[in-house]
Amino acid sequence: MALRNIMNFKKDDILKKKSRAVENIDGRILTLLEDMTETMYNANGAGLAAVQVGILKRIIVIDDGRVLIKLINPVIVEEFGEQQELEGCLSIPGVYGRVKRPEKVVVEALNERGQLITLEGTGLLARAFCHEIDHLNGILFIDKVLPGTLVNINQSEPEIR
């Protein structure tokens, strides 16, 4: 396992690009999953998309405080309800804003063994699924932040967008 550099939205245009589906789960993909997990934990994050470490592949890792989830080619297939909560992002350090998300989602993806799995997430986990899958589509949380809720705790960097 190795730590990877986390892309920054101000310097790395890759974050606005759409990721490609994983065609073959091989040793490189499994190593990437391990590296992403280590990188996420090292940065005290709750989720990370492959694009955030510079790889345009549809891969995410999430830890909601109960379990580590590693997903390949995830897709949200159902959404229920609504929540509006504060979000941040490892690629946009020190910036937070309120984002409208579904209260519950159903996600289909491949696991590390290439098996199709279906997961449900509510609350924080639903937000994490949506946030990380947005990354795979080149969408950042600041693109969806509710008006008037964006906060930048980096006093020396007032310009967000």
Give the role of each language-model region.
Residues M1-R161:
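Positively charged
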